């Protein structure tokens, strides 16, 4: 048995430990833990605004993406003191969760074989008040038209949200579908936000009942795309933009420009750990100005009532 190797990777002013760097997390592609860590160091600038100040759930794969995995909420005792943590209340006590405020933390999580970080939809200083809504466009497993229905659905939902005075953004999930994201001003609670999201989805599904549904039970969807709004609840998470997914070839959840939905070749796993950095270098971050798009739900609710 060979001894495990250790090295360090420089991230800002910190030297982050990297154990067993040659461990292959995606064996078919030869993608190692060191390559995962380097990827997250590379994309930290556009990714961190979507992680900062948020409790984080770590999706870990110690034996590679095809091996046993687990969602890790509580911070282990061995985590270094420089990683920020937050006490999150739960029934009967609390849980200590990591907060990824800097690139060094992001790289350290990669060393823990955290392939995919999942942040909360609210921030640590006001856990009950979401600052984003997420709509998950989940295609039918029997959808035979490729990704066309998902692209069409994103357009329809984006138009409706814009009609309500909101500023939605769209990204591939790196898995099966697309996410639409709406930034909020934190003046509402989760119950209100979730109810609003479900009403929006219901309106759109009623307009296109032959293609869309809000039915969570798969056997009731009859081949229609599922408009999933269930992530919009306290303690729920959503995959972070630019996060790697535990799927073949290490696809990445990728923010898009809206006009990219016009590309018939677009797919949910279009970009990977190895191709995304080149996209960023060439085209920049499509969501660079997203923080200026925060909106209140109050006016949007009034417009929705009037439909």
Model-flagged regions — what are they?
Residues 1-31, 35-38, 48, 52, ...:
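C-terminal accessory nucleic-acid interaction domains of nucleic acid-metabolism proteins
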Residues 53-86:
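Polyanion/phosphate-binding surface patch
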Residues 59-61, 168-174, 215-219:
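Short beta-strand
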Residues 78-104:
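Class II aminoacyl-tRNA synthetase-like tRNA-binding/catalytic domains
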Residues 96-176, 184-192, 305:
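Signature for HUH/AEP ssDNA processing cores
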Residues 179-185, 225-229:
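A short beta-strand motif that forms the metal-chelation/ATP-contact edge
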């Amino acid at each position: 048995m060979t001894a495990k190797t250790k090295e360090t990777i420089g991230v800002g002013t910190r030297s982050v430990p990297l154990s067993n760097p040659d461990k292959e997390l995606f064996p078919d592609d030869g993608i190692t833990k060191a390559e995962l860590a380097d990827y997250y160091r590379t994309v930290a600038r556009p990714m961190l605004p979507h992680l900062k100040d948020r409790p984080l759930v770590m999706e870990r794969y110690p034996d590679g993406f095809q091996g046993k995995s687990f969602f890790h909420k509580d911070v282990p005792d061995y985590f270094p003191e420089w990683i920020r943590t937050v006490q999150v209340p739960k029934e009967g006590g609390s849980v200590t969760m990591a907060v990824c405020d800097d690139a060094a933390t992001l790289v350290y999580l990669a060393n823990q074989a955290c392939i995919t970080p999942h942040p909360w939809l609210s921030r640590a200083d006001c856990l009950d008040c979401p600052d984003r809504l997420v709509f998950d466009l989940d295609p039918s497993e029997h959808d035979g038209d490729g990704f066309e229905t998902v692209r069409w659905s994103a357009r329809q939902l984006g138009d409706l949200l814009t009609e309500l005075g909101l500023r939605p953004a769209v990204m591939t999930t790196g898995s099966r579908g697309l996410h639409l994201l709406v930034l909020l001003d934190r003046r509402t609670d989760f119950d209100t936000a979730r109810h609003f999201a479900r009403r929006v989805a219901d309106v759109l599904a009623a307009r296109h009942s032959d293609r869309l549904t809000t039915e969570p039970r798969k056997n009731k969807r009859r081949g229609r795309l599922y408009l999933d709004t269930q992530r919009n609840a306290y303690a729920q998470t959503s995959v972070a933009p630019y996060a790697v997914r535990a799927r073949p070839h290490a696809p990445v959840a990728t923010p898009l420009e809206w006009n990219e939905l016009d590309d018939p070749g677009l797919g949910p796993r279009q970009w990977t750990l190895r191709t995304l950095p080149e996209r960023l270098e060439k085209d920049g971050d499509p969501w660079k100005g997203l923080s200026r798009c925060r909106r209140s739900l109050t006016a949007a609710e009034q417009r929705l009532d009037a439909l």
